[in-house]
Amino acid sequence: MSRWGAPPLLRNNKRGKKMRKLLFGTVMMALAPFCSQAALAQSDVTLKIITPAVTANAGIRDLAMGFEKEMGIKVQIVTLNMAKMVDELKSGTPPADIVFLPYALMDTAQTEKNVANGSRINIGRVRIGLAVHKGDPTPDISTVDKLAAVLKAADSVMYSNPASGSMEARIIDGMLNAHPEFAGVKRKISMNGEGGQAVARGEGQMALQLICEIVNHPDQLTSVGPVPDSLGAYIDSAAAVTSRSAHPKEAAQFLKYATQPGTYSLWLGKGLERMK
């Protein structure tokens, strides 16, 4: 379960852009004591992180910048389609040092000993939400019936292409197929990027999208909020040091840095609810 449940920040995005800037500044100040003992000289180590978009868009980039600045250790972030993550973990060159994966894939990675024993950290949950054009009304989607009414009233509801291997797209497609309340929704698959990006380009009225991929377009999109919990439309993610890491000590340092209490507000501001 989430630390906070459905966070108010994600339900009301009117002040989202300013709030995210404030949160980032606050988090960087909070992290300063963590790094007070760190050598600021540049290290010759470069950590390679492999991650799907769900966690790449939910705070990793900001944390990597802070880690590089404070610890002097470079971080390379490689964002991959979910379908390519496991192959890259097992045989990518150079080998990854840190991997972010949904729970089920991380469970398998542990069983197959592709991650270091005891290094797994459960990161958090990113929910599917509804995106509308910035400035458009934000409807009530707090129940399945209300969400269905909003979606059916739209000229088009965009989402990513399930055939691309996107876990997010499969979750959305499965949600719409599994519930009769959504019969009649005018679905439109984005053939060029995310559904939210398509809405931002003017190709549709609204989009179902991971919230972390809505709030990163503050000038074009507004996050109406997450879909109801009963729909099970979310991705829970974990991180671990890989068993092939050339820099396991530094990789463990990054995970400790990225998951200390002072980072909670940054993750939340990017659409990820930290887990207990």
Regions found by a protein language model. Give the residues of each.
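Sec/Tat signal peptide C-region and signal peptidase I cleavage site
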Residues: C35-A41
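Bacterial N-terminal signal peptides that target proteins for export
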Residues: K17-T26
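Short, Lys/Arg-enriched N-terminal segments with co-localized hydrophobic residues
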Residues: R3-K18
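Bacterial N-terminal signal peptides
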Residues: G25-F34
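Exported/periplasmic ABC-transporter solute-binding proteins
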Residues: Q42-P95, Y103-E112, I121-V126, V132-K276
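Leucine-biased recognition of intrinsically disordered, low-complexity hydrophobic segments
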Residues: L9-L10, L22, L40
